[in-house]
Amino acid sequence: MDRNSVIGFSLIAVIMIVWLQFMKPEQKTMLDPVPPSREMVQKDAAENAPASAAPETAAESLGSFAKASTGTEQIITVDNDLFTAELSSKGATLKSMVLKKHLDVNGKPFNLISEKNKGALSMLFLSNDGKRIDTRDLYFRSLDTKKSETVTGKEKLSVSFVLDVDASRSMQVTYTFTGDSYVIDYDLKLNGFGSTLAGNEYQLDWDGGLVYSEKDTADESHNAISSAYLGGGLLKLDAKDSKKRYQEEESGKAEWVAVRNKYFVAAMIPERETEGVFLQGTKKDGVDFENYTAALKMMIPAGQNSVTDRYRLYVGPLDYNTVRSLHVDLEKIMDFGWDWLTRPFAEYLILPIFNWMNKYVTNYGLIIIIFAFLIKTVTWPLSLASTKSMKKMSALQPMMKEIQEKYKNDPAKLQSELGRIYKEAGVNPLGGCLPTVIQMPLLFAMFYVFRSSIQLRQHGFLWVKDLSVPDSILDFGFKLPLYGDHIALMPILMAVTVFFQQKITPTTQTNDQMKIMIWMFPAMMLLFFNNMPSGLALYYLMFNVFSIAQQAYINATVSDEDKAAAAMQVAASASPSKGAKKGGKKK
């Protein structure tokens, strides 16, 4: 590998490390209380109450809703092709969501909704008598007599809960499930509530984030956020510091609000125009889990006594094609890096090719190998041109050293003469690193795809159990600086291929330089890839294997005639000027 390639890779590695640490999405930290009309969404109201305050009775805390504070909870289980959900009559909320096709790190089904919470969904509002109402504190009655329901294929099933506040006011919540979909239709019907809600507004709230499912909880915590999409822009909130309280509140029409962990998302998509959104996040000391809230703020039109609001809930995997099919830009919540560089590579090249190949090849390890071969084939002309350029550069080395020695005290003249030699020999000094530079955006994009795409999750290849995480063969139990807390085998094999690739690639370096670089660069890449997804290391390993084969072929077929031609071309162009000088002396 030539010096320019080494420098390019080195700079890219440094940029990548710094970028991962410091170029995370900027978050706003709001430490001041929100206006009183918005405090109904604060879950810590009770925690901030004076210690000496006596507990409120139901009548004091719930006002006209007090009679609904007692009752018997009824759980209704809905089973479809993709998940098993539990609905509770207390709060008419979603209590549990267990996915069938996605397991946790131990290979077992897991509940995406925290069992510590009272449920994920609730309606929050401030009543006209000043009471903060969370419907999860109220007992609804179920309109269904069955405790368990099953729906398959394109069939639909509805489950409804009703709360009769008094003779003139009622609330009805209806969940509609489809047998083969993660989407749940959620209808909220308010009758006689025109004079009940302070400010004529309420919030539909998803509380508690999503339960983590991966072994590396710190990494999953890094991916967990609360988010909203409104005004054509993505609003993110990341509670990364346990000493701060994070919240965001924006007005306007929202396409959706959502909470996510590394591979799963829960999104609420309104049918009617929203008043705005509210996001909140907290993190406790010594715990990786981050607790998130996402809420849609809805306004009941003035003079309207009743309203029916319809929403779509998506609770399931962050599969690009699936979330994109909702046509609300929910795929924007997936982190593919820079929108202007790596995201287009991910969305319009990597994922489409992977999805197409997956129709014919089921093993993602093989898909990665085929993809590496395709990329190497596409870059073949560049590699050939790069090799020829390096051979010419090698032929020019004696002449360049002579000029460098001659004009060492005249930098301007030195650069002028070197430029003349490059031009007359038809050599681009940066041509050797062009293939490397071109594939870097692709490599970055693949890092994001392999790291966050659920397609690779728990898909193995040979000894690798999960291509989306490092293929650790030995865990230390402690962290080494730069290297990490484990030994991954795939990066070691990849570093070996980097070593051999350098050995057979033409270079303009001196022997001393080559000795240093041939060991330093593989070591640097080993450090860099040890904590990367094993799928990415597999791609680069196979790309290097194909590069070695390609380089061996080029070395065998591209003769040294280019070297001689380059030297002769420069010598011929230099001769006339020398002859003119000699002729001048004879005169």
UniProtKB/Swiss-Prot annotation:
Biological processes per GO annotation: protein insertion into membrane; protein transport
Gene3D superfamilies associated with the record: 2.70.98.90
Cellular compartment(s): Cell inner membrane
Chain's role: Required for the insertion and/or proper folding and/or complex formation of integral membrane proteins into the membrane. Involved in integration of membrane proteins that insert both dependently and independently of the Sec translocase complex, as well as at least some lipoproteins. Aids folding of multispanning membrane proteins.
Family according to the record: Belongs to the OXA1/ALB3/YidC family. Type 1 subfamily.
Subunit details: Interacts with the Sec translocase complex via SecD. Specifically interacts with transmembrane segments of nascent integral membrane proteins during membrane integration.
The protein's name in its UniProt record: Membrane protein insertase YidC
Organism: Chlorobaculum parvum (strain DSM 263 / NCIMB 8327) (Chlorobium vibrioforme subsp. thiosulfatophilum)
